[in-house]
Amino acid sequence: MSLINDTVPSAESSEKVDTAYEKAKELLKANPELAGFTGAASVDILGEAQATEELGLTDKVSIVGVGTPNATREYVKNGTIDAVCLWDPASAGYAMCDLAYKVLAGDEITEGIDLGQKGYESVTIQEGANRCVLGNAPLILNTDNIDDYDF
């Protein structure tokens, strides 16, 4: 992978699909060799998908990013978006409820503690002023599994 020029292009969407669409369209027109997008905001890949389809580049441009199954389903199923990355909010919620229960019960929260959900069986503790509990439960949606999720 290489940058398309010596400066990193700004495609900040400010969480707006229309802005992501306009930025993606600008980048695609200015850089015909552009091979892919990755979106960090939840709406980025929607705008990128719209621009890619409009310009007839779905077979040339790969799109991967953050989103939800219901918002991205059409684009994933038609092949415009290659993968959607996220966390299952239900699993994360159950894990955090288990963590809250353990804290309230006075249990010691230590490295490797099991919070009873896939990806949270052996969490990592990040020490510091804002102590964090980190799980490892990415959910990668593609044409094979996107219909398994409805949110």
Where are the regions a protein language model picked out?
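A residue-level marker of the well-folded mature domains of exported/periplasmic proteins
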Residues: M1-F151
